[in-house]
Each structure stands twice: as C-alpha cells, then as structure tokens.
A protein has these predicted regions:
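Structural recognition of an alpha-helix C-terminal capping motif at a helix-to-coil junction
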Residues: 37, 51-58, 71-83
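Sigma70-family region 2
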Residues: 16, 44, 57-72, 92
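C-terminal edge and immediately downstream basic/flexible tail or linker adjoining helix-turn-helix-like DNA-binding
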Residues: 2-5, 97-99, 125-127, 152-161, ...
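N-terminal module of bacterial RNA polymerase sigma factors
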Residues: 1-34, 182
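A short pre-motif secondary-structure segment
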Residues: 140-144
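Arg/Lys-rich amphipathic alpha helix in sigma70-family domain 2
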Residues: 66-68, 79-99, 171
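Internal acidic/polar
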Residues: 3-9, 95-119
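Amphipathic, Lys/Arg- and hydrophobic-enriched alpha-helical face
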Residues: 28-46, 63, 130, 175, ...
C-alpha cells in the first residue's frame, strides 16, 4: 500500500527548490499505482502502460512550476495521463492503416497473450467489451467503475459537464451490457 500524504504538505514542499524533489517523490509514491492501472485499462499492454506512466511523471515534473492549486493534484495528474493515453492511442491508430478493426483486434490479441493479465473469464469478457467503446466512453467508464471517481472530478479532468459524463457512462454501461448479454 502506498503512503498517503497531505496534499497541502506536498504542495508546500514543491514551492521550495530545496524540497521540490522530495515533494515530487511523495507524489510518485502516492499516485503511481492508481495512475498505472488507469493507463493500463486504456492501453492494456504492461510495457506501454509503464512507458506512459513514466511520460506522465516526466511531464508533471517538467511542468510542476505551472501547477495551480485550483484543482486537486490528482486531477492534474489524471489529466496529464489522459493526454498521454490519447496521444499514444492516436499514434497507434495512425500507424495502423490496414483497417478500422485492426487496432482493436491487435489490442485484443495483446490482452489475450499478456502474461500480466490475471483476470478470470468474466474480467476478460469485460475488457473485450470495453475495447468496443469509443475512447472517451472507455475512459469515463474506467474512472467511474474502477476508480470510483466522482463526476465532478472527472469534469475537471475532461473539461466537460457532469451531465455529459453521466450520459457517456450510461451509454457505455448499456453497450457493455448488450455485448456481455450476446456472449451468454
């Protein structure tokens, strides 16, 4: 279990150049695991998730002086991770010019052969269903279902209304229910 730090304490450490590194180490210790799993649910590959997590923390470190405490630190980190995932997925899609189904098929193949995937058949079926969702719906579903994140915090991350996020989650759930119902 990762240590839990008071956000004000960490922010105070980040303000001083002499303690900035220690403050950032606390951020990494606090948020690495939950950010990893959020990223992993989007890209599914352990190696890609690790790379994107590292990129997220590098960008956070390089831009820590620009962090405004108007939002929570976790919201800011999730936003960076979300942008990293979107950039990665867009590059993957652009590189795959064979067909529109190829990226999903490739991702599904990676999931099925991933030695780090420890889920059962139900979890595998859910992950396959998630692959059929548009990226934003998948991200909203992951944040709500797995992270139990409040819509208000998601609104800060996505820069969209709570109502739109609720609708996106509802549509995602309906699509997943339909897909899982067809597999029975």
């Amino acid at each position: 279990m990762n240590p839990s730090y008071n956000e004000r304490e960490v922010l105070a450490l980040l303000q001083e150049e002499s303690t900035q590194k220690r403050g950032f180490e606390m951020i990494v210790a606090q948020y690495s695991e939950q950010l990893y799993w959020q990223i992993r649910r989007m890209v599914l590959s352990h190696e890609d998730a690790n790379d994107l997590l590292q990129n997220t923390f590098v960008k956070a470190w390089l831009n820590i002086d620009y962090f405004r405490a108007e939002a929570k630190l976790s919201t800011w980190l999730y936003r960076i991770a979300l942008n990293e995932c979107l950039t990665f997925l867009n590059k993957q899609r652009a590189a795959s010019t064979v067909s529109l189904d190829a990226p999903a098929a490739d991702t599904l193949q990676k999931l099925e052969s991933d030695p780090y995937f420890s889920g059962d058949k139900a979890q595998m079926a859910l992950q396959k269903a998630l692959l059929t969702l548009p990226e934003k719906q998948r991200m909203v579903f992951n944040l709500k279902y797995y992270q139990e994140m409040k819509y208000e915090q998601m609104s800060d991350i996505f820069g969209t209304s709570v109502g739109a996020l609720k609708a996106s989650y509802h549509h995602a759930v309906k699509k997943i229910e339909k897909i899982l119902g067809e597999e029975d």
